[in-house]
UniProtKB/Swiss-Prot annotation:
UniProt subcellular location: Cytoplasm
Protein name per the record: Urease accessory protein UreD 1
Extent of Pro residues compositional bias: 1-10
Region (Disordered) location: 1-35
Short name of one Pfam family: UreD
A Gene Ontology term for the protein's cellular component: cytoplasm
InterPro entries: UreD
Keyword set includes Chaperone: yes
Functional description taken from the UniProt entry: Required for maturation of urease via the functional incorporation of the urease nickel metallocenter.
Stated family: Belongs to the UreD family.
Length: 288
């Protein structure tokens, strides 16, 4: 005699794809001056998911190195940084390696960076490059609120495939939004949207002229607009074959745009320019 038969699995259950593991990385960091003229110290730090911060010793200023232990971003992952500098604090933020945005079968990954700088605070936002692979889909948001006397220098380098391997972005999504406010007023806004055959879009003369990598450098600091001629001279010194760059200044800030046939030469241009413009060496991880 047999017991009751178990119901047959439904076709939906038989063909169901396993649930994906989504990465959800979060960093919250608040820093402030240790004492008048005595450097900067960590006041609050919270880490979640695969996001970690490391603080190398022996650096001139407090330096935070962002680590993504997941090894990259893909398929609907979410990462966020909430960074606050109290009045008078100084910080350099970078990443341990290039951030890789891997292919997705549909879900869009999201990266949100939110910065708050008090009066007299100074932040150098210097992550290493971001590399997009074919069919990557990502939306990034960069928002900063600065007191009138705060100083922000931010640099971002993005590679659309690895030129040395002949990679192309046949289909993908790259949406990048920058909003920076000074004293509560919007000082800088920029949005980039590349969707579909990104490499083909970049091949158009009016968009990228065949570039495979781009960079943005922004200086929102007191006196930045007056440094335009210096910036142009330093760009000329930093240039290398396969790169092109230009600087402009308005509304109290200075912006640099650069393009490269490959990310390596463009990264070199950015590093040389920033080292001269800031009169400080790049973070050590940039040299590894």
């Amino acid at each position: 005699m047999h017991g009751p038969l178990a119901p047959a699995p439904s076709p939906e259950r038989l063909g169901a794809a396993p649930a994906r593991q989504r990465s959800d990385g979060r960093i919250r960091l608040r820093v402030g001056p240790a004492r008048p003229g005595g450097g900067t110290r960590i006041l609050d730090l919270a880490e979640a998911g695969p996001s970690r911060l490391r603080f190398p010793r022996g650096t001139c200023a407090l330096e935070a190195v962002l680590v993504n232990t997941a090894g990259g971003v893909a398929c609907g992952d979410s990462f966020a940084i909430d960074l606050a500098l109290e009045p008078g604090a100084d910080l350099v933020l970078t990443t341990t390696a290039a951030e890789k945005i891997y292919r997705s079968d549909g879900p869009v990954s999201r990266i949100a960076n939110t910065l708050t700088l008090g009066e007299g605070a100074g932040l150098a936002w210097l992550p290493q490059e971001t590399i997009l692979f074919d069919r990557a889909r990502v939306r990034r948001r960069f928002e900063a609120d600065l007191a009138d006397g705060a100083a922000l220098i931010a640099a971002e380098v993005v590679a659309f495939g690895r030129a040395a391997r002949g990679e192309r972005i046949v289909d993908g999504l790259f949406a990048d939004s920058w909003r920076i406010r000074r004293g509560g007023r919007l000082a800088y806004a920029d949005s980039v949207l590349l969707e579909g055959p990104i490499s083909d879009h970049l091949a158009r003369p009016a968009i990228g002229g065949g570039a495979r990598a781009c960079a943005t450098i922004l200086d929102v600091s007191p006196g930045a607009e007056a440094r335009l001629e210096e910036a142009r001279a330093r760009l000329a010194e930093a240039a290398s074959p396969g790169t092109t760059a230009a600087a402009s200044a308005w509304n109290g800030h200075l912006a640099v745009r650069a393009l490269g046939d490959a990310v390596g030469p463009l990264r070199g241009l950015v590093a040389r320019f920033l080292a001269g413009y800031r009169a400080l060496p790049m973070p050590r991880v940039w040299q590894s």
